[in-house]
Amino acid sequence: AVVFPKNSSDIQAVLELTTQQKSCHSIKITARGGGTGTNGQSLTEGIVLDCSRYMNRILETNFKQGWVRVEPGVVLDQLNEHLAPQEVFFAPDLSPSNRATLGGMVNTDACGKGSRIYGRTSDHVLALSCVLSNGETLESVPLDEDKLSAYKQKSGIVGEVFKVVDQIVLEKADLIEEVFPKMSRFMTGYNLAKVYGNSEKNFNLNYLLSGSEGTLAVVSELKLRLTALPKYKRLLVVKYEHFDDALRDAQILVENDPAAIETIDEKILSLAKEDEIYLKIKDFIVDEKQKSGKKTRKTRTISLLEFCGNNKNKLEKQVSA
């Protein structure tokens, strides 16, 4: 079965039913976005909660302060088309951007091309409105010590959430520091390391909710940070005879701080040569003559480097370095 909620109250009603009615306790509720995840996250034998049909409105945009408020069913391309005239965008850049919903992006803490400089979805979340398993609503924003203390005093399961999470991340701080790798892209799950280990050093439940795959709460509304569109972009194509050579060069290429690097192997290039797109990209993948002009080096692998920024001279230096 599929439920298409029209608002937060509908989500509350569904979750209240499954917790308060004994006959419904065994029913599993699975939130679904655009269904673009590759790990089968939205597959279930229970009830699918699909917010994409009705909860897909852009509620409020504040270009001066740089944020937007949306419902979880808004699609990434839909939002960025709305923002483009003001030369801003929501930075995480996913390949299925014409289908991926913002609610799904938060729940998987999605990132894509450009994540080296823009980070993950969670790095752009300012606030989340959520519905907990018993139907109670929870508002998540970064909290300083005084505000966190006030949130802990809230009645019901909401106050308990803030108490328990704060207790866990403080008591297990050494273990969290030891276990969680110092990498920008490493996991989807309960990101305990960022609850306090964020740039503002405040208690931030957004990082825990992001990437939790809907297992902690159902997101009903999002407030997201906007980013200025880069004025200039450059694409650099580096050709290789062997795939291993491209892998060895990766660390060197990263030092020039590209927004994205993508390496394409011989199998994909051979498929591209059989496709109608070949005429558009053939200059990127043809074999290269060596400087002597006598020998030809086979192009079996290419690395695509994208550079972007607002300073044209700086960008040209990056590309030519």
Q: What are the functions of these language-model segments?
A:
Residues 1-25, 29, 47, 51-96, ...:
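N-terminal glycine-rich flavin-associated loop
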Residues 152-197:
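Flexible inter-domain linker/hinge segments
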Residues 229-242, 257-260, 299-303:
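Short glycine-/aliphatic-rich beta-strand segments at the starts of folded cytosolic domains
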Residues 36-38, 96-103, 188-191, 195, ...:
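A glycine-rich phosphate-binding loop feature that marks nucleotide/adenosyl-phosphate handling sites
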Residues 35-38, 42, 105-114, 202-227:
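Conserved phosphate/anionic-ligand binding catalytic regions in large, soluble enzymes, centered on
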Residues 51-53, 126-130, 194, 207-212, ...:
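Short beta-strand elements
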Residues 25-28, 90-94, 170-189, 247, ...:
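Flexible, glycine/charged-enriched surface loops at secondary-structure junctions
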Residues 143, 222-224, 247, 254-321:
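Terminal amphipathic helices with adjacent charged low-complexity linkers/tails
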